[in-house]
């Protein structure tokens, strides 16, 4: 009995009907089917996804990154990586991103928390964060309304803001200060179209997409640097001008993309 063939047959019998497991890999090297990869857990593995940071980061840090003109960090440091290993993302992570002064704007430090029971210290008067109705759930499960939902806390010079995810409106805390400043705050402009309409109208040239490449490209690069820190469990120092990691040769080598597997090369020719 060819044990390798027998094992492969077991994997094939698990593949859902109608699923092209080879095509599912796209550029990634082939892995035998495993229900820990599909359906929902693929993002938890370094070979396939970017963990919670790559998944939720774009829905939480997008406005901060865009409107504060953050660009790329000069340093990313792992503060906590619970259950670190070389195969899949930690059970919980705390990362610190440092951005330099940008013109007249001061330096910014972002601390990212994700994972099981890994919460930031909440400021007085925080209250409860509301769960947005437009937040997608995992595998169609019902979202749980809890005190602390995905979101952000922004500490400015004189004010503290809290916000949720997916473009939710920021609010000032504590509530007493928000009420005192209510007549001084600018109106939040209403979007002329929703998320789906904007995409279609942008395709037709009637609107500008709200997340063009010049916005989401650098934002995704920030997340890639964070994921590298999670994977290597090392602080990285990044040269924003040369776009190279200057304190670790192995980490710097990872900036060069792994060649796509055979059959996918033509899609990566410039």
Language model region names:
Residues 40-50:
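Flexible glycine/proline-enriched surface loops and loop-helix/loop-strand junctions
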Residues 56, 72-270:
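Glycine-enriched catalytic-core subsegment of oxygenase/oxidase enzymes
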Residues 17-20, 60, 195-196:
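Stable alpha-helical elements in mature extracytoplasmic
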Residues 9-35:
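Rossmann-like flavin
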Residues 1-7, 11:
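Single conserved hydrophobic/aromatic residue that forms the stacking wall/gate
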Residues 31-42, 68-71, 192-200:
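Active-site-adjacent bridging/hinge elements
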Residues 48-53, 84:
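Glycine-rich "substrate-gating" loop/helix at the edge of Rossmann-like oxidoreductase active sites
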């Amino acid at each position: 009995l060819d044990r390798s063939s027998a094992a492969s047959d077991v994997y094939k019998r698990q593949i859902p009907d109608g699923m092209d497991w080879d095509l599912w890999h796209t550029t990634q090297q082939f892995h035998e089917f495993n229900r820990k990869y599909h359906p929902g857990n693929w993002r938890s593995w370094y070979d396939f996804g970017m963990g919670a940071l790559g998944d939720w980061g774009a829905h939480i840090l997008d406005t901060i990154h865009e409107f504060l003109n953050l660009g790329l960090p000069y340093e990313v440091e792992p503060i906590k990586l619970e259950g670190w290993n070389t195969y899949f993302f930690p059970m919980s992570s705390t990362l610190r991103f440092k951005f330099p002064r940008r013109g007249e704007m001061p330096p910014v430090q972002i601390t990212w928390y994700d994972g099981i029971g890994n919460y930031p210290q909440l400021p007085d008067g925080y209250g409860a964060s509301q769960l947005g109705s437009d937040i997608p759930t995992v595998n169609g499960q019902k979202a749980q309304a809890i005190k602390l939902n995905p979101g952000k806390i922004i500490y400015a010079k004189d004010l503290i803001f809290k916000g949720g995810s997916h473009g939710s409106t920021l609010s000032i805390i504590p509530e007493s200060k928000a009420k005192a400043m209510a007549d001084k705050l600018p109106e939040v402009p209403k979007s002329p179209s929703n998320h789906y309409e904007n995409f279609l109208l942008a395709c037709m040239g009637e609107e500008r997409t709200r997340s063009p490449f010049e916005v989401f490209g650098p934002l995704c690069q920030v997340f890639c640097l964070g994921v590298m820190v999670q994977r290597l469990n090392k602080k990285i120092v990044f040269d924003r001008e040369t776009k190279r990691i200057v304190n670790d040769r192995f980490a710097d080598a990872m900036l060069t993309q792994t060649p796509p597997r055979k059959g996918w090369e033509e899609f990566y020719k410039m």
